[in-house]
């Protein structure tokens, strides 16, 4: 393995552990919560310069949720998983994501118009 891959893998496991340590009681299965945290950690390692959980801000979370919406088919997740991920990450990081992704109703034109592009 190349050194960069080893460093990214190490950072990935550190982020997963930091996020798991902050996890409180969830209303869905712990296995699902862990898989959502692992997906978030993979995103952070591959697409951001975040070194620890303390570096994650609202802008990073918004970009992640947009990434989920654009790539949900490739990632094999559905809208329920995305909504769970939003609640989980918002709760873990004390990040408030007030934008159109919180509303999954059919009347949310902004959400569904961005998916058609």
Curated annotation (Swiss-Prot):
Which cell locations does it reside in? Cytoplasm
Disulfide cysteine pairs (residue numbers): none
Just give the chief location class: cytoplasm
Q: Which BP terms does GO give this entry?
A: positive regulation of single-species biofilm formation
Q: Name one GO cellular component term.
A: cytoplasm
The answer, when asked if Heme is one of the entry's keywords, is no
Q: Name one Pfam family in it.
A: SwrA
The alphabetical list of record keywords is: Cytoplasm
Task: Say if the entry is tagged with keyword Cytoplasm.
Answer: yes
Q: What does this protein do?
A: Required for swarm cell differentiation. Plays a crucial role in regulating the degree of cell flagellation.
Any further remark recorded for this protein: This protein is functional in undomesticated strains of B.subtilis but not in laboratory strains, such as 168, because of a frameshift mutation. Therefore laboratory strains of B.subtilis are unable to swarm. The frameshift in strain 168 is caused by a single insertion of an adenine in the codon for Tyr-12 which leads to the premature truncation of the protein in residue 13. In addition, the C-terminal section of swrAA was predicted to be an ORF (yvzD) by the genome project.
Q: What is this protein called?
A: Swarming motility protein SwrAA
Q: Which organism is it from?
A: Bacillus subtilis (strain 168)
